[in-house]
């Protein structure tokens, strides 16, 4: 993916001594980049909150970002909270384009927080992930439907996550589209957590029991790229709680091979 010159955030993390630090920090509106915090229990892990000063994405917005983790760095990049996707009748679609790169022996968790789809909003997300041998990335993609949405005001949200090798070869592509209200009102929040790279594969073990209001399933990605944990939840709060509980160890060691039934609301394609 070729990012345009006016990328909103261009960040590089690397290991420096016992810590992970930012070695490249370029950003503009709407992002605000603060400091990297070290975990007292795990000083090698650096955590950064990627703040959207606008707090919303409006029709016509195109937000591009690139994040790299190199030289054995271990970084967790989180959003400051759920972001509204605004819309107007007949308005332009908005878009977010993200490029993630993790080199050998480095680790990244990217959790930008759920997007909240509001009336008439049309939004596209494109995320490209490249993980070198012995590196790993955990990528969270989540959306919550605003409770006031109905068939007359429902717009659309499209999300495509692509996994490529360092040489550019396509390993996996997962595309999801939601352009109408779910058939039932049981689930209004949806997420997928992608575990890409060293050691992440779908297994044949029974997964943990789903908590009330949550349905989960695990998909093994093609070409040994990793696995994806799909989540449907009753609401945004339930989804966020489950995302916090979900760990890489759980997905790797206790992944199940269940798949969603045809009644799930997203149309999905995977190659």
Curated annotation (Swiss-Prot):
Subcellular location: Cytoplasm
Gene that produces this protein: ureD
Record has Cytoplasm as a keyword: yes
Chaperone as UniProt keyword: yes
SUBUNIT field: UreD, UreF and UreG form a complex that acts as a GTP-hydrolysis-dependent molecular chaperone, activating the urease apoprotein by helping to assemble the nickel containing metallocenter of UreC. The UreE protein probably delivers the nickel.
Pfam families the UniProt entry points to: UreD
InterPro entries reported in the protein's UniProt record: UreD
Single Gene Ontology MF annotation: nickel cation binding
Family listed: Belongs to the UreD family.
Protein name as annotated: Urease accessory protein UreD
Organism: Mycolicibacterium smegmatis (strain ATCC 700084 / mc(2)155)
Listed transmembrane segments: none
Assigned keywords, A-Z: Chaperone, Cytoplasm, Nickel insertion
GO CC term (a single one): cytoplasm
Domain of life: Bacteria
Known function: Required for maturation of urease via the functional incorporation of the urease nickel metallocenter.
